[in-house]
């Protein structure tokens, strides 16, 4: 059932109310109480009388009663089966229910969300009257009506929460922005002073006798530099974050040159170099271990050893015999690709 609170019960199936249920459904079409979605489990029998709750909440006058009579005539013209007496009886049964005041209070709470102050005051006064008139309501137990009243009270409470959530989120956002602005400006004093200066002319601050020249003419207010606010904001930002900016500047000035390895990694590579100076060609397994210990990748390690051998290592003349000691086949590829004898050793010896 996709209806509004003003159309409660319209188009619903038959219920335990019998003929009253069909009559209640026809009394809904031209009345409106709340434009709210309904639960499909709500009974149809008590749907139509809720279209009259809005009138009961505001103490109906004779003109309102006359308007209700016009509604009944309108229903009769369209073949409605509910008489005015039946509608009043069902309405009286709902009004006499102990939860009737809670239902109207929940409805008024929905109306209060985002309402202007004057409307909020009137709604609060109306809610106070409802609380005063709530005492003394007694009605025989009617499980169907009890279920209906409880369901719609809960629905209105949830609807009010949905209405309030975006407003609360907006207020929280504004508070955060205000706190950030106060933090940037070093407090609310300077911003308040700027606002007072900007609004001073419109509030008549410059119309006192102190602002009059000897000829009786009003002195013009001093000109305000439009960039003064930006300068003040810049000053406040520098004052607050100068230490952080200086540390960043020092960090950038100490930034390593491109391609230079970290000191700790170079020390570990040099340590391995000293231990294997006679044959400084690490195997693939040793390269993986060095990469894990230094935090470098394979390419960095390969480049470091190539450059290190070019600059600081020269094989001796008897190297072809010495290097066979502890030599294993996987180093042959590295020996060939690196070409130590062609580039560093034998080439220079033969040149």
UniProtKB/Swiss-Prot annotation:
Residues 214-229 have a biased composition (Basic and acidic residues). Its main location: nucleus. InterPro entries: ELK_dom (IPR005539), HD (IPR001356), Homeobox_CS (IPR017970), Homeodomain-like_sf (IPR009057), KN_HD (IPR008422), KNOX1 (IPR005540), KNOX2 (IPR005541), TALE_homeobox (IPR050224). Keywords: Developmental protein, DNA-binding, Homeobox, Nucleus. Residues 253-316 bind DNA. This is Homeobox protein rough sheath 1. SMART domains: ELK, HOX, KNOX1, KNOX2. It comes from the Eukaryota. Residues 232-252 form the ELK domain. The keyword Repeat does not apply. Plays a possible role in patterning the placement of lateral organs along the axis of the shoot. Mutations in RS1 alters cell fate and causes unregulated cell division and expansion in the leaf. Probably binds to the DNA sequence 5'-TGAC-3'. CDD domains: homeodomain (cd00086). The keyword rRNA-binding does not apply. Belongs to the TALE/KNOX homeobox family. GO terms for cellular component: nucleus. Residues 1-23, 57-82, 187-229 are annotated as: Disordered. GO terms for molecular function: DNA binding; DNA-binding transcription factor activity, RNA polymerase II-specific. Residues 57-68 have a biased composition (Low complexity). It is found in: Nucleus.
